Amino acid sequence: MVIEKEVRKMKTDFKQHEAKLEITLEGELNTHSAPELDAKFQEIKDSVSSIDIYMERLTYITSAGLRILLAMEQEMEQKEGALVLHGVNSEIMEVLEITGFDTILEIV
């Protein structure tokens, strides 16, 4: 299953392979785009136990975006699954470090 969708200033690409979900984010994960990302996640969360998020093209993240990542992490933790962030650039990493999310989320 491949779903592509424009989300305000952010493009998301969801690919689900059985219980594994791959999400590619491009643009800004902000107050406008986070709710739509969350809505899509809520639709499919029951069918996944592992999430890989590819962030190479993510240019900006706000607290709304961080909340979505935390919710995804908590959901996967309940299922004894995993959430892994890939390709985090230096600007996004700085936000994750300042907020302490680098100690909560698995980043490779």
Residue ranges of model-derived segments:
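Short beta-strand/loop segment at the start of cytosolic alpha/beta domains
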Residues: 1-24
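Amphipathic alpha-helical interaction surfaces in cytosolic regulatory modules
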Residues: 31-104
